[in-house]
């Protein structure tokens, strides 16, 4: 009877194991873990942050073909971005102000703050890599363009990163060399462009 509840059977088990071996597991498999060291030869120098949108993962390049991999939430289809930028500022317990200017600023360090425990500010206006109290959004296309991380993961990443660190977002690993030679370029989310124009 227990086998009937799981309609996948042996075929599903084999497919699941193959998917884990080939793709390195699904986005949800890491939701409770800190960064995981993996083999990832993406062709970028150590210290680079690479976001692979279709995997919903962020890689911190450690060097020698290795990276620290974190599950993340990326922008929704309308706000998904690709390109190369860099970390322009870093804050512990950052305050959050609504993008549209309406509403009060939420002070840093409280559990309901949408930016979580740490924020890495990117050179593109309003874009950040930050923590979140919305753990269920990790592994999804759920944000307005920011990259959300579990609070424990962004705290760990914060200690590895420095201001000026390159940040590259690509749609898939096939695009790994697309932004290697460019400084700041790519497609920003619509709201970030609007904010830059103000």
Where do the model's predicted regions map?
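Cyclophilin-like peptidyl-prolyl cis-trans isomerases
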Residues: 3, 30-31
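Bacterial N-terminal signal peptides that target proteins for export
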Residues: 2-14
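Hydrophobic alpha-helical targeting segments used for export or membrane insertion
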Residues: 11-22, 83, 96
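Flexible, glycine-rich phosphate/dinucleotide-binding loops
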Residues: 21, 67, 176
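Exported/periplasmic cell-wall-interacting domains
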Residues: 44, 64, 78-79, 94-95, ...
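Cell wall/extracellular polymer interaction/catalysis modules
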Residues: 31-94, 109, 117-118
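C-terminal segment of classical bacterial N-terminal signal peptides
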Residues: 20-30
């Amino acid at each position: 009877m227990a086998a009937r509840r799981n309609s996948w059977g042996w075929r599903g088990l084999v497919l699941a194991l193959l998917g884990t071996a080939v793709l390195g597991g699904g986005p949800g498999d890491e939701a409770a873990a800190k960064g995981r060291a993996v083999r990832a030869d993406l062709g970028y120098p150590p210290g680079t942050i690479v976001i692979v949108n279709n995997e919903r993962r962020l890689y911190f390049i450690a060097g020698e073909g290795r990276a620290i991999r974190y599950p993340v939430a990326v922008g929704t289809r309308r706000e998904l971005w690709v390109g190369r930028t860099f970390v322009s500022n870093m804050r512990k317990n950052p305050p959050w102000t609504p993008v549209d200017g309406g509403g009060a600023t939420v002070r840093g360090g409280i559990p309901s703050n949408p930016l979580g425990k740490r924020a890495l500010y990117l050179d593109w206006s309003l874009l950040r890599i930050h923590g979140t109290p919305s753990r269920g959004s990790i592994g999804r296309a759920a944000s307005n363009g920011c990259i959300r991380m579990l609070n424990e993961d962004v705290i760990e990443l914060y200690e590895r990163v420095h201001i000026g660190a390159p940040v590259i977002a690509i749609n898939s690993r096939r695009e790994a060399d697309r932004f290697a030679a460019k400084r700041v370029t790519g497609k920003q989310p619509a709201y970030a462009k609007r904010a830059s124009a103000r």
